[in-house]
Amino acid sequence: MVEGCMPVVAKAGTEWKGIESFIGQSVAVNPSYFAFTGAVMDLGYDNPLDVVDWKVYSSYDDALAAVQNGEVKYALMGTQNNYGVKQLVDSGDIEIVSYQSEIMENYSCCRMVGQTKWVNDNPDTVKAIIRALLRAQSWYEANKEEAVSLHAKRIGQEDDYVAAYMMDDKHYFVNVDPLKNSVC
């Protein structure tokens, strides 16, 4: 499971009262993201599609541009956008008003899954995979700075780009334990 450090951004100075700030607004968030539509439903709205103008863009960059040009009030950014978002925050152009994981606690942007039949037919392989993942996570937690460099090299980016999300200990969490917040 990964809580992927996905910020919600707005123009600098925009009021934020929580998810209720979405009501009646245009937002660059795909309504299929239950962290948001579910949170709107938790406010008592039966159909979140009727009370928020959800705009879907082909990229997070386009969603960010929509905030900057006033087309939408709020936009969800992807994990990979943290470096650029932080630069815009530092310049005073935008601000981070929340994170997806603050809208719905423990909402995971990424989970590993396996088909039930394969899992049931391969118990030793599944156990070996879980052991390897737990060992890898243990190493990652003890060596985050080195992990940043390794990941940056793997994806062809600078360390600062990867550190912008991987070193955010408040919003970026990796947990490979299959029993933690499991989905059955």
PLM feature spans:
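Bilobed "Venus flytrap"/periplasmic-binding protein-like clamshell domains
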Residues: 7-87, 105-106
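A structural motif
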Residues: 100-108
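Ligand-binding "clamshell"
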Residues: 1, 48, 84-100
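Glycine-rich beta-alpha junction loops
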Residues: 80-81, 103, 155, 170
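Secondary-structure end/capping motifs
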Residues: 121-184
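A bilobed periplasmic-binding-protein/Venus flytrap-type ligand-binding module shared by bacterial periplasmic
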Residues: 6-16, 108-124
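Solvent-exposed, acidic/flexible segments
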Residues: 2, 29-33, 56, 60, ...
